Amino acid sequence: MSELDFTQFARYGVATVYEAAGQQGLIDETLLQIVPGSRVAGPALTVRCGAGDNLMVHAAIAHAQPGDVLVLTLPQPAPISLVGDLLAIQAHAHKVAALLVDAAVRDVEELRALGLPIWSRWIRARGTTKKTVGTLNEPVTVGGVTISPGDIIVLDADGAVVVPPSQAAQVLQATQQRDAKEATLKPRLQAGELTYDLHGYRAKVEG
């Protein structure tokens, strides 16, 4: 998958990609967009930390490639901060595209000033140990979706959606088609037409 294709996924955004993918791959939990306005897509580097521990986050940043989306998980989601400003600074310096944290983050004002796109399940100052060796680049589950290393993660204000690389070309084409269709529809809606009529819903409801 080229950088251009990642950029296109990011441009179309989570909702459009999710619908174009047949309503598949949505990470079905509330994610906090730490840096407002962030819109990113990139390949997943998956991380499973030990319970209450973030040693593997340090390892992940050391092994990350530019453009990676780090997917940070615990054995069970918990409001424990896996990332603060020091780790975020390192990730940013190594050109990580984004962090998806199925746990908490802290130092939020500093994170926003840094500007690294981060999505987390919680904001919490509660810290971790650094003792337990977990795993890198093995499948993890977030919000009911299994994420494998290299899966495309699309993130924006609506949350996150996962696209397997094997489906990327098909989903991107469907996304482009859906976006083009909506672009032609919007002026008609602005002019006062209704999807109730345009999509045949009136006939379904009223006969």
Go through the PLM ranges and name each one.
Residues I153:
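C-terminal binding/interaction regions
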Residues G159-V161:
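Channel- or pocket-lining gating/hinge segments that regulate access to a cavity or pore
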